């Protein structure tokens, strides 16, 4: 699997039928479509992500009434139901990669208010190790995460995710996948 950019990541998440928050990709002139999305997936907060470039502007917690104002200036962006709606339910967030040679890279946060970006800048766990390292047992729910990666054959892929204490997202599962990366 080769994923070279954010659009390919979205496509791969969809093709693999992985759990995600309701999300849609929009262009600058699609305000009517944005309103339809908001009506279809009512929530207190939405996340807006610039998809025109890696590391683009990201707003995690935008109130529904502010979304149309916030998207001004974006040329290509996604809107999704925000994890901020589930701050009381988030257990773990960050990114993890299990390589086929048994190496493991994990940058994770147990802060329930953290985003993936927060986890990367202020992690509770930051390991570059192998699958046999006993320190991995210190990561809450590590076995659950590993089983998810294995069940979905996500080896050799950086998986940005969050784990919740209840089912969330379009598949009502405990793990949400935000992004998959291999070559960017």
Regions found by a protein language model. Give the residues of each.
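Nucleotide/phosphate-binding sheet-loop regions of phosphoryl- and nucleotidyl-transfer enzymes
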Residues: 1-184
């Amino acid at each position: 699997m080769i994923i070279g950019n954010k659009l390919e990541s979205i496509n791969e998440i969809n093709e693999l039928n992985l759990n995600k928050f309701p999300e849609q990709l929009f262009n600058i002139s699609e305000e009517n479509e944005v309103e339809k999305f908001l009506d279809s997936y009512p929530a207190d907060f939405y996340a807006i992500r610039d998809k025109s470039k890696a590391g683009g502007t990201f707003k995690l917690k935008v109130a529904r009434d502010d979304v149309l104002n916030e998207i001004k200036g974006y040329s290509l962006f996604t809107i999704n139901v925000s994890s901020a709606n589930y701050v009381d339910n988030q257990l773990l967030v960050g990114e993890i990669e299990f390589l086929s040679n048994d190496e493991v890279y994990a940058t994770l946060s147990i802060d329930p208010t953290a985003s993936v970006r927060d986890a990367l800048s202020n992690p509770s766990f930051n390991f570059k190790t192998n699958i046999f390292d006993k320190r991995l047992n210190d990561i809450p729910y590590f076995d659950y995460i590993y089983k998810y990666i294995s069940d979905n054959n996500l080896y050799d892929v950086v998986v940005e995710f969050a784990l919740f204490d209840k089912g969330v997202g379009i598949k009502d599962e405990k793990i949400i996948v935000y992004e998959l990366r291999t070559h960017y």
